Amino acid sequence: MQTRATTPRSNRTAVVTGATSGLGRAAALALSKEGFHIIAVGRDQIRGQEIVGEIHEAGGSAELVTGDLLTAAGTQAVADEILSRTSAIHLLINNAGGAFNSDERTPDGLERTFALNVLAPHVLTEALLEALSAGEARVVNVVTAVPARASTSIAAIAGDKAKSGMQSYVANKLALLTLTVEDQRRYGERGLSFVALHPGVIPGTRFGSDSPGLMMKIGPVIAKLIGITSTLDEAAQRFVDVGTKSVEGGGFYYEGVLREAPRQARDQAFASELRSTLEALG
């Protein structure tokens, strides 16, 4: 079941994935206050109706598209539903993602971390490309801080030896950062801009809900002790800033501040191999 909007009051449309909780919900609320008509994408119908209702009550405009981004077919179905609602998209927030402890596979046979964090944003962006071009859109891919030694092996990210947990999550977010740089190179001339955003570590969100129990308990504590936590309001404002202000196409924004992308993300050979892998799967 899909929830359609009342008459949109804005001629700017923002699509936000993972919009039914946590960072995605906060971003959707903040962007609606900036005048965007929100297309909220999520799996949970009840949570989705709640966020749409909250936006409407605040005087904004929103609608819900429910679907599962864990498979290419599911992601394509979400894209098709979005395109049935609008012909122009001005902002796409690829926020849906997660870290998984168990080494379970999707119905497509792919490791879940890769399927949700890399393949889904690629399939969705490609499927919406004409509508994004019509809106001269900005695409914001949500990534994370990347250690200097993070893997750029396709086999480690998407192959049979892909690992679960945070190691896989970081490697896949590096792949998404690489894809951001590559998509800017490929589609920038169409009037599109692509940026990668690490919005900060946000205690209390549902991120990592399938991660090891010990990591779930001590991760937020360690983050707080070393001073790398942010509030939901701070993170939401970072989405607004990179989504609406002047940015460097292909840039990596760490907590909203432009930083040089890790060298791995600028590796053209890895970028080409990654895109070939994604095109074969999507």
Regions found by a protein language model. Give the residues of each.
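Conserved glycine-rich cofactor-binding loop
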Residues: T20-S21, D44
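C-terminal helical subdomain
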Residues: P220-R263, Q268-S272, S276
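A glycine-rich helix->loop->beta "capping" turn
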Residues: R9-S10, A58-S61, E81-N94, F100-R105
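Active-site Tyr-X3-Lys motif and surrounding loop/helix of classical short-chain dehydrogenase/reductase
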Residues: A73, A77-S84, N101-D103, D108-A115
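Catalytic loop of short-chain dehydrogenase/reductase
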Residues: A5, G97, N101-S102, E111, ...
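Rossmann-fold cofactor-recognition segment
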Residues: H56-A73
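Conserved glycine-rich Rossmann-like NAD(P)H-binding loop of the short-chain dehydrogenase/reductase
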Residues: E34-E50
